[in-house]
Amino acid sequence: MRLIQNMCTIAEYPAPGSTAADCCLGAAGRRLVKIAVVGASGVGKTALVVRFLTKRFIGDYERNAGNLYTRQVHIEGETLAIQVQDTPGIQVHENGLSCNEQLNRCIRWADAVVIVFSITDHKSYELISQLHQHVQQLHPGTRLPVVVVANKADLLHVKQVDPQLGLQLASMLGCSFYEVSVSENYNDVYSAFHVLCKEVSPKQQASGTPEKRRTSLIPRPKSPNMQDLKRRFKQALSAKVRTVTSV
């Protein structure tokens, strides 16, 4: 697996005259799979994405501004270019979910979605059904692949949600389910993305609606590059070393 070091934000609008199939191709003609990661604030979405990309865990992050990352991965003999779109936390109001248009465009843009909740936050679990329904409404006429991820499995002493409830709900919604500890286990994180990529078929991608393809035209806010991620990882590691030394 090789991480592509040119981090950006959501895919550029396809060139004039390009076809739906062209929009599904990444660098070197490889099939491109676009994944949006959504969920409530504080559930570990950014940590999940960075863990998948770098195999590293960084405990502290700045509030997410919506970054997109790209890597290559080999799945069943095929090399895929994967774009993973991190998103800000979703809020809930009396009238339901609060999803701004930028988030809606991210979801429409995606070929698949990861819905993340934390076993330490029951409200994040309660969001799953509404969020899944919202995702499917933004993809009418198709069954978008979705994986539900229960994060922070290592924090059993503050658990508010039994992971079995997440499994049952995911099964009811027709989604795959993974219980993970982003801080302690990379393999489970990788498996969740691996399975999701397998569920995205070339036929499904090529049948994207014109509306879905137009959502590729999204402003490109500045996002961190690999050097920035490495810098933050070193800072987090240095902070841990200082803490141990001072004890």
UniProtKB/Swiss-Prot annotation:
GO annotation terms (biological process): negative regulation of transforming growth factor beta receptor signaling pathway
SUPFAM superfamilies for this protein: P-loop containing nucleoside triphosphate hydrolases
Keyword Nucleus tagged: no
Catalytic activity: GTP + H2O = GDP + phosphate + H(+)
InterPro entries xref list: P-loop_NTPase (IPR027417), Ras-related_GTPase (IPR051065), Small_GTP-bd (IPR005225), Small_GTPase (IPR001806)
Amino acids binding GTP: 39-46, 86-93, 151-154
Family (UniProt): Belongs to the small GTPase superfamily. Ras family.
Official protein name in the record: Ras-like protein family member 11B
